[in-house]
Amino acid sequence: MSSIALGVNIDHIATLRNARNVDYPCIIEVANIAVNNGADFITVHLREDRRHIMDDDVFRLKSSLKVPLNLEIAATDEMLSIAIEVKPKCVCLVPEKRQELTTEGGLDVGSIFSYLVSFIEKLHSYDIDVTLFIEPDISQIDLAKKLHANNVELHTGKYCNNATQNELSKIIKAAEHCHHQNITCHAGHGLNYQSAATIAKVPYISALNIGHFLICEAVLHGIGKSIYKMKQVIASTD
């Protein structure tokens, strides 16, 4: 079996729930189904505008999950306070714009480097691992290393939207550089069965984060079957 871990993002279960302001589908139940069908960890993005995941969702997931919780947040004081209270296994810092439909790209680490120094130190002081969601760019990885980030997650959106050898080469080179810098390398955004199979073959990538596609597949085939199939797809890359 592949050593690639599968993180399942369940944000859009909350989107469906919030469309009618009801308490179903139950995000805890979906998370448990995901885990029972191969999810190695659960990812949620608590956005500043609370458009899908709510604060209570995060606390409930943390208290009930038998696998690690990966909490995506913007690097703000409000989110830092919530993360410290929740104490997830890992916090993934992502850029955020209120008008965007989804995260549009990686962090510009250099532009907020000084701010991130104390932000990351604070998370580490509570034994929370830190991931930086970045473009597959060598300079961003070097900055992540200086910040003592535990992991980076390479933004695969550009490759998924334009599956050229050039875009894939950027990811391959970035993952190799992470290895040389002793930073754990994850990848995610826009992945489907086909693109996930390709990215899972990239040396030194240890985890994939996949959400929207799996939730869409769940409409047709069920959440359990969709996650199980994805797990088999990335496992078959050995």
Swiss-Prot record:
GO terms for cellular component: cytosol
Pathway participation: Cofactor biosynthesis; pyridoxine 5'-phosphate biosynthesis; pyridoxine 5'-phosphate from D-erythrose 4-phosphate: step 5/5
Record field: catalytic activity: 3-amino-2-oxopropyl phosphate + 1-deoxy-D-xylulose 5-phosphate = pyridoxine 5'-phosphate + phosphate + 2 H2O + H(+)
Catalytic residues, chain numbering: 45 (proton acceptor), 72 (proton acceptor), 189 (proton donor)
Molecular function via GO: pyridoxine 5'-phosphate synthase activity
Residues holding 3-amino-2-oxopropyl phosphate: 9, 20, 190, 211-212
Site (Transition state stabilizer): 153
Pfam families: PdxJ
Keywords, comma-separated and alphabetical: Cytoplasm, Pyridoxine biosynthesis, Transferase
GO biological process, any: pyridoxine biosynthetic process
Compartment(s): Cytoplasm
ATP-binding is among the record's keywords: no
Binding site for 1-deoxy-D-xylulose 5-phosphate: 11-12, 47, 52, 102
EC number: 2.6.99.2
Family statement drawn from the similarity comment of this UniProt entry: Belongs to the PNP synthase family.
The protein's role, per its UniProt record: Catalyzes the complicated ring closure reaction between the two acyclic compounds 1-deoxy-D-xylulose-5-phosphate (DXP) and 3-amino-2-oxopropyl phosphate (1-amino-acetone-3-phosphate or AAP) to form pyridoxine 5'-phosphate (PNP) and inorganic phosphate.
HAMAP family: PdxJ
Binding partners and assembly: Homooctamer; tetramer of dimers.
Protein name: Pyridoxine 5'-phosphate synthase
Organism: Ehrlichia canis (strain Jake)
Gene name tied to this protein: pdxJ
